[in-house]
Amino acid sequence: MSGYVGVVVSDPWLQSQFTQVELRTLNSKYVSVKNQNGKVTIEDLPPLFAKLKALSATFKEDEIKGMLGELGSDTSTDVSFEEFLKIYLNLLSKAAEKSGGHHKNSSSFLKACTTTLLHTIYQSEKGPFVQHINRYLGDDPFLKQFLPLDPHSNQLYELVKDGVLLCKLINVAVPGTIDERAINTKRVLNPWERNENHTLCLNSAKAVGCSVVNIGTQDLAEGRPHLVLGLISQLIKIQVLADLNLKKTPQLVELLEDSDDVEELLRLPPEKVLLKWMNFHLKKGGYKKTVSNFSADLKDAQAYAFLLNVLAPEHCDPATLDAKDPLERAELVLSHAERMNCKRYLTAEEIVEGSSTLNLAFVAQIFHERNGLNKDGKYAFAEMMTEDVETCRDERCYRLWINSLGIDSYVNNVFEDVRNGWILLEVLDKVSPSSVNWKHASKPPIKMPFRKVENCNQVIKIGKQLKFSLVNVAGNDIVQGNKKLILGLLWQLMRFHMLQLLKSLRSRTLGKEMTDADILSWANRKVRTMGRKLQIESFKDKSLSSGLFFLNLLWAVEPRVVNWNLVTKGETDDEKRLNATYIVSVARKLGCSVFLLPEDIVEVNQKMILILTASIMYWSLQRHSRESSDSSSTQSTTTTCTSTASSPAPSVTEEEEVSSLSGEVTSLAVGDAVSEITTVSEEASIE
């Protein structure tokens, strides 16, 4: 492990307000404005702060200059880095106040792809989160010795430090995500075991749709409150919104009005569907307003009163709507909900305060308990809206991968969300920096159809420059939502990204491109170095379905990560499934960011098999690169010996093995995308 410490701040409280990613970014900005004397003054700060994303949407440079002038100091006064951080926090707090406490970066759910620089998560939200944990994990065989937690104490932040609780909570949000056999669950874990749990947690959180771009394993090991609460809130949100789609709840089709299209409902994110459901019932109940958020529009509790009267008239209390005091009305609403068997998720005070996090969870809880939708023939066709299983799995994989990149947009449905081209341009900018001409791009909302086509045409143009196979593919195909073409394009993007990551670590290849054959040969050699005879001929090799090759590969790159007592022979379908589930969790525990499902291994989905193998290779080469760097910087014999002893697999020849394969050529993965896109293009031209 690296001995890197990061940016250190002498004030522990101040240090706790930022992640290392944030501190490094802010330190870089601070250093960039130093004058010739190596100093930073107050007058240097307004232009800098005005460019920071967390402040630029709220304040102009002149406003920031005025606020800094209120500090009462001479503008030529030197500002230390710690003073810079304190001033920044003060400005963030003013930004939150100006936007009514709901600054775009202050969401306690850590909305996808936003920065955590502004962590204004109300401490009161911790209580409901703790109650949620007590409710869903209270009977867990391992955690029941620590539960229930006291909502008024800091027990939560202590318990998360070993990583077990968060891993278990991920499985509550999306059952089966983590093979719990891979979680280290001894009562006392050593630092290495705790780090493995946190790594497994973060990679699994990404795999269910959480944004963790600013959270590291060390943040969880230290139990940093704002980051812990942010991650927990995302998991709770995913859990409570899981059924807000036509596939899980086909009755939702009842929400459609005559002018609405099913496609319109399909493209709505879950929270928007929940609002649509709420307004549907409010309209039936005679409520005159439209609820557009889970905060200000619910503060007076009137919408809640109307909603519950429609859903559960048998528990209606006339005093609720007659109440003049919002707090009193909120209390009566909660009593009504309890009579419906909705346990209290928030307090009357939190309704009146407008906590969007807790209100969303409460409305979702009401939906689950009693959605008030009819079960008749009207929604029967929604149940028949079945998609190809492999298409659904691929869409899920690409959606999660895109959301893990840290782009500004968030993808809810790949086939709908990429049609204006903007998200694809954001992805291209991530995987191939500076490839996008933003002057010729249109940002959503885009009203003019030709602007969408322009965006998509640029996507196709860049794809061809990157040597993607896009024969007879035009931007309009994306705008029209051609699923096969979109999947083919996304596969090439994902593969290109992985190969670029691998290429960046191969210093001995002299710029030669990485190929699929390189990855295949590396995997076979790695397994062979451990004395195993298992070898595969391609990423379509049917023997891969047993899972044994991948378990041996994982064991070869890090022997301690595989517990062979948990491995089956992989002969029956059940044994293959057990091995595949274990492989996915072990890979994530190791540090691989993978989005495939166990079924992809059992069925030998060659695309996902390639990405899994490449991810393991990337982790192995990355560790070798890091160890080589540490060894070079320390020039210590002791360190070198320790590094060698801790890595049984010979890592010295890691890059030599790979570079020796550079002459091997393959078109395995590209060919698959080529044939898929070419076939669809031909079909389109025939039609």
From Swiss-Prot:
Biased composition (Low complexity): 630-652
Region (Actin-binding 1): 123-371
Tissue expression pattern: Constitutively expressed in roots, leaves, flowers and siliques, and to lower extent in stems.
Annotated segments matching region Actin-binding 2: 392-621
SMART domains noted in UniProt: CH (SM00033)
Gene Ontology annotations for the cellular component aspect, listed alphabetically: cytoplasm; cytoskeleton
Residue span, EF-hand domain: 7-55, 59-94
KW Amino-acid biosynthesis (keyword) present: no
Ranges for region Disordered: 627-664
Superkingdom of the organism of origin: Eukaryota
A GO MF label: actin filament binding
Entry keyword set: Actin-binding, Calcium, Cytoplasm, Cytoskeleton, Metal-binding, Repeat
GO biological process, one term: circadian rhythm
Domain Calponin-homology (CH) intervals: 123-240, 268-371, 392-498, 513-621
Pfam families: CH
Matches recorded under InterPro entries: Actinin_actin-bd_CS, CH_dom, CH_dom_sf, EF-hand-dom_pair, Fimbrin/Plastin
Predominant location category: cytoplasm
Residue positions binding Ca(2+): N35, N37, K39, D44
Gene3D superfamilies associated with the record: Calponin-like domain, EF-hand
Additional free-text comment from the UniProt record: Cross-links actin with a constant of dissociation of 0.55 uM and stoichiometry of 4 molecules of F-actin for one molecule of FIM1.
Cross-referenced PANTHER family: FIMBRIN-1 (PTHR19961:SF62), FIMBRIN/PLASTIN (PTHR19961)
Domains: entry comment: The actin-binding domain 1 (also called ABD1) seems to not bind F-actin alone while the second actin-binding domain (ABD2) can bind F-actin alone. EF-hand domain and the last 65 C-terminal amino acids are not required to cross-link F-actin, but enhance the stability of the binding.
Functional note: Cross-links actin filaments (F-actin) in a calcium independent manner. Induces the formation of actin aggregates. Stabilizes and prevents F-actin depolymerization mediated by profilin. Key regulator of actin cytoarchitecture, probably involved in cell cycle, cell division, cell elongation and cytoplasmic tractus.
Subunit and partners: Interacts with F-actin.
The protein's name in its UniProt record: Fimbrin-1
Organism: Arabidopsis thaliana
